[in-house]
Structures are given as C-alpha cells and as structure tokens.
C-alpha cells in the first residue's frame, strides 16, 4: 500500500472533528495524481495562512478578520468559482484548485476554512443542499458565508430562496433553513467531495474512476447502505458480478426495509448465475 493510501486509511477511520480538511482533500487528489506531494501542498496552505496572520493585529475583531480573509483569498490570491466549466474534474482536486486558483464551492471552502483557521477564526463547513457553505462562529451567533461568491455573507432570506428552488410548493421557513446549517463532520465533507467526483466520472463514462471514488466513500461510511448500492451498480457496469452481488447483499443487510428491496432482490437473482459462470 502506498504512503498516501495508508494516510487515507487512517484518516477515513477517524471520527475526530479536527482532522485536516486540506490533507483529506489532497489525499483524494492523490488517487488521480500519482506521486502527488501532499505535504508540499499542505506547506503552501500553511504559508498562505502565515502570511495573512503576520499582517493582522492581535486584537483584531472577527468581522475585521473576515474582511481581511476575503480580500486576501479572493483579491490577492485570486481564488474564484469556475462558473464556465463547473464540472471540470480539476475543480474537485485541491492541488489543481491551489495551482489554478479556481474551483467549486466545496474545494474553495476547504481553502477558505484552512486559511481562516490559521488566523484564529472558528470556521466550519456546512453541507447545504444547493452548494457547500461555511459557518463562522461568533460570540453572539454565527455568519454563513459563500466562498463561491467571494465570501459573501448570506442571511436567512438568501438561504430560504436557495432552498425554495428545491422544495416546490413547500414553504421554507427559518426553522427549516436552520436545520441545514449544522457543521459538517470532516468525513461528511470528504464524502461529498467524492460524490461530486463520482457523478463527474459516471457522466464521462469513466466507471473505474467512479468506482475508486465510490470505494472511498464506503470506507468513510461503512454503515451507509446507499453507498453499497451505488458501488454495486458500478461493479455491474464493469461486469464485476461477484463484487456487485456482495455489495447488493450487504445493502439489504444494512437496510432490509429499503423501498427498492424487491428490485435489489431481483438484481441479486439475475446476477447469481452470471457470477457462477466465473467459477
């Protein structure tokens, strides 16, 4: 097992809240970029944070620190959202985002959080339905920020509008918005990044790459039945029938009352003779 793979294995099994988001994101990228120097990129992020920290007064307020962070990340360093080619897989690999200074909400959020934490801000990722956001904790509450929109602050009405586009004919009140603003655990952030990649690779017909992403999600979430179902479908497309059978069966063990349990049972019955031919 390679050194990055060993590091990923340790990280995937950790449920600690202080896991480095940058390290996890770079280890995801190391699957695609053989020989990627993860530590070199971590040092670059550390240096970005150090440069900004040295400029700030020790008694700076949270609001002032956020203004300084936004100016530094978006104006000086030049990070921005890739609205022209949103589904370019490079937007999901942190090494590429650091090099190209362009990304999607979740990778920009990782950069933003990592630099912000190095200047003393309490920042958390928020797995909001429309796209990934950042929460900054204050003494008197919290601010929701959108790194994809250059760190714009979002109020309840802004968030309601974003949710209303998804929840047709359902009134989205403040309590519903609040329910989506819980800080995301590192494993959930990594899983969301990998799901993005899986979707991109499936769309491109790159099923082996999609399978690699899916397997990493399973490592992060071994109790999530849906992820075994997703991986089983990829195994089927690759004609890995035994592996597909194993995952479908595990899916039903984890979720015997699944809505699609009858469909999965049929898939198992159809795959069993195909797998038997391989003996």
Where is each model-derived feature located?
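A structural boundary/capping signal
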Residues: 1-279
């Amino acid at each position: 097992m390679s050194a990055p793979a060993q590091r990923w294995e340790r990280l995937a099994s950790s449920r600690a809240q202080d896991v480095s988001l940058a390290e996890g994101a770079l280890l995801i990228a190391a699957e695609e970029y053989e020989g990627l120097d993860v530590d070199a990129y971590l040092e670059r992020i550390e240096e970005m944070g150090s440069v900004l920290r040295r400029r700030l007064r020790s008694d700076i307020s949270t609001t002032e620190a956020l203004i300084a962070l936004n100016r530094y990340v978006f104006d000086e360093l030049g990070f921005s959202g890739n609205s022209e080619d949103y589904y370019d897989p490079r937007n999901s690999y942190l090494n590429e985002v650091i090099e190209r200074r362009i990304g999607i909400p979740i990778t920009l959020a990782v950069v933003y959080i990592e630099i912000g934490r190095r200047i003393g801000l309490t920042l958390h990722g928020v797995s909001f339905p429309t796209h990934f956001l950042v929460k900054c904790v204050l003494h008197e509450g919290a601010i929701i920020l959108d790194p994809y929109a250059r760190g714009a602050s979002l109020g309840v009405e802004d968030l309601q509008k974003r949710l209303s586009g998804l929840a047709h004919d359902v009134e989205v009140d403040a309590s519903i918005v609040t329910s989506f603003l819980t800080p995301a655990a590192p494993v959930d952030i990594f899983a969301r990044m990998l799901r993005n990649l899986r979707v991109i690779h499936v769309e491109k017909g790159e099923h082996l790459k999609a399978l690699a992403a899916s397997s990493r999600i399973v490592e992060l979430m071994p109790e999530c039945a849906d992820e075994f179902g997703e991986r089983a479908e990829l195994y089927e497309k690759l004609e890995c029938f035994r592996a597909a059978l194993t995952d479908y069966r595990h899916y039903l063990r984890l979720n015997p009352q699944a809505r699609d349990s009858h469909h999965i049972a049929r898939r198992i019955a159809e795959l069993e003779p195909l797998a038997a031919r391989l003996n």
